[in-house]
Each structure stands twice: as C-alpha cells, then as structure tokens.
Amino acid sequence: MRTALLSLTFLLAGTMAAPAFAHTAAPKKKVTATTKKGKILPMKEYIDQLMAKMTLQEKIGQLNLMVAGDITTGGALDTQVGSDIAQGNMGGGFNIKGLNKIKALQEIAIKNSRLGIPLLVGMDVIHGYETMFPIPLALSCSWDTEAMKKVGEVSAKEASADGINWTFSPMVDIALDARWGRISEGNGEDPYLSGVMGAAMTQGYQGVDMRTEEILRANRIMACLKHFALYGGV
C-alpha cells in the first residue's frame, strides 16, 4: 500500500511537469478567437459568451464522442451522425482517419449547427502517426527528453495535417506489474522518469505554452495524459 501511494504521488507530480516547463517560455501573443460576425475577442471572453449561449442539451452534446465505426464512407450529411452534429448533440470523434471525411464532418459542425462549434477529433497517436517511432517504453530507456519531444512534434505535425487535433497520449501509468497488458504504451516503472518523459512528449504535441497562440498553429495537437490514477499496474 505504501509503495502504491508513493508511486501515485510521483505520478501526479510527473503529470504536472509540463505546466512547470511552460513558465520558462518568453511571453507571446495571447490567444484570440473570431466570432461568426467577425469580431475578435480574447479567448476567455469568447468562451464565456459561447457558454452563456449554449443550452443544457448542447453542453451535454459536447461530451459525446462518436467512434470511427459510426462513420460510413461518403455522404456524411445523410447519416445519423451528421444529423447529431448539426443538432449540437456531438462534440467530437475518436479514431476517425481521413482528411476528406473529417473535413466533411467539420463543415457540418461549423456551417449547420446553431453555434458553429468545431469538432474535437481525437486519435491514439501513441508513438507516431504516419512515421512510426519506437514504443514509449523503448523511448524512455534513452532518458532523452529532447528525442521524446521531437517524437511528439513530428507526430503532431503529421496528425494535424490529416485533421486530427487531439491525441490520447502520453500514457503515464506506472508499470509495477508485468502482467498488465499495456506496459508498452508507458515509460516503465520509475515515477520520475515517467513524469519527465511524459512532460517532454506533451511539449512536443502542444508546444511550450498553451496560453498563447502556439497551440493554434497548424502543426500542434492537444495532449491528453492517461489514465486515471491506479488504472495501471500499481
């Protein structure tokens, strides 16, 4: 029990490493957004106004993710998924691959839904998108955070070019039991190593500081550290 609690403490500390690194970046232009009427607002103000306009059903809809199996080839407007997006009942998709398919779905969200909120399109980009790198467990053996960051950068560039804007990575579960079946996705059994390598991968995906326009560049995607604490072999 003591070992598990200690591992959890270091795991949580490791997952907070990326924001800590972010504070070393030089100040950059703040993120803004453009309304449908062409007005440019600070991102926080834009989001506050958008949230105020949303119905409860639309807020719930933002929590719904479609999976790739729900999407048929062509004719997105004619599917139930297309209807759900247009009605604001769908916030994003998971493991949908193909730029034309994603573009068609995004056009429904932006042009046909009441508020024009774009979809979040996520995928398990674990160790590369088109270019395949060694698995995270192997990469972590190098203790090379710059190499890990580069993997994130290349993965983000390739995935974003295909319409992906969100990855379910890095995985920072601490692998203390070899019987657990997902050890290859993580950085091994050392909590400190898992933290610094996970932070480096996150920087590669997102850039250094999400509070600036860097995250909006075409070659960036959002990271999502996983999984829930105590899910892995701890």
List each model region and its residues:
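N-terminal export/membrane-targeting signals
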Residues: 1-22
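Glycoside hydrolase catalytic-domain context in secreted enzymes
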Residues: 21-234
